[in-house]
Amino acid sequence: MNLKSRIYEGAITHARTKPVKHNFSFPIYTFVIDLDELDLLDKEVRFFGYNRGSVFTLYDSDHLGSGDGSIKQKLKKWLIKFGHKEKYSTVKMITTLRVFKHTFNPVIFYYCLNSENNIVYHVAEVHNTF
C-alpha cells in the first residue's frame, strides 16, 4: 500500500509570562491527509475511522460547516463561492483528528495542488479553542 497521507509526532507548547507565569507542553499527532485516500485509510489503517468511531476519527461534519458532502466537496463549493476557479487535482489536509471522540483542533490547513504538484490554494479553517 503506497499512501500519500502521513502522521507526524510533535508537541504543543504554550508559555505565558503575564499576568501569571504559566506554561505547558504535551505530545500530539498531526495528520497530513490526502482527501482522495479517506475511504482507503478507513478500510486499511487500523485505529482510523472516516465518518465512524475509532481511536482516531475524521468526520466530514466537523469541517467546513455541517452541510452535506465530503470535505473535498465542501471546500470546492467554498472556493467557487468566493470566485476561485483555478483547477486543482489534489487536496491535502493538515489537522489533528478526534482521539477517542475528543477533539482539539484550533486550525486546519488545506493545500490544493494542481497536476504539477504546485500549491494553487492554501486555506486555513480556524475554530475557537474555547
Q: Which residues does each PLM region occupy?
A:
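Mature, function-bearing regions of proteins
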Residues: 1-130
